[in-house]
């Protein structure tokens, strides 16, 4: 997957998305209030940041190939690509977070879609 985000599979209670994060870029600081998230790093080096508020990301850990990150509902989080190639990961959302068939070619596309969904 070379898109920022591709919703690979969406069920009633679960969704799997593939992501490719550019060099020096990040997922974007966010919080999901209604569901948990599982992230697995398939390829690359990253920094995971998590906390109870966007101003208090008191958990930070370097991760790489094979690492899994569990993010409980209500935790602010971001993942920053620290490597010199795109960061490849997959995300499991429970419940689904994005419309079935979602494809965001770039982070900018994803941010615009999120803005339009909220407002």
Range-by-range predicted roles:
Residues 80-119:
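Double-stranded beta-helix
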Residues 34-51:
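Glycine- and acidic-residue-biased ligand/ion/polar-headgroup-sensing regions
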Residues 11, 22-24, 34, 41, ...:
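A short, compositionally biased micro-patch
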Residues 18, 48-50, 89:
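Short hydrophobic/aromatic-rich beta-strand segments that constitute the beta-sheet cores
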Residues 53-72:
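Short acidic-glycine-tyrosine-enriched beta hairpin
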Residues 1-29, 35:
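A short glycine-rich, His/Asp/Glu-containing loop-to-beta-strand
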Residues 29, 48-49, 71, 77-84:
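Short beta-strand His + acidic residue motifs that chelate non-heme Fe in jelly-roll/DSBH
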């Amino acid at each position: 997957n070379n898109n920022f985000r591709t919703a690979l599979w969406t069920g009633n209670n679960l969704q799997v998305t593939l992501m490719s994060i550019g060099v020096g870029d990040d997922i974007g600081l966010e919080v999901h209030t209604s569901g948990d998230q599982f992230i697995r790093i398939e390829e690359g080096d990253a920094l995971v940041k998590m906390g109870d508020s966007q101003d208090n990301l008191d958990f930070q850990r370097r991760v790489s190939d094979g690492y899994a990150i569990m993010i409980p509902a209500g935790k602010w989080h971001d993942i920053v690509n620290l490597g010199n190639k795109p960061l490849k990961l997959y995300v499991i959302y429970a419940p689904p977070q994005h419309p079935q068939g979602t494809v965001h070619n770039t982070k900018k596309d994803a941010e615009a879609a999120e803005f339009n969904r909220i407002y």
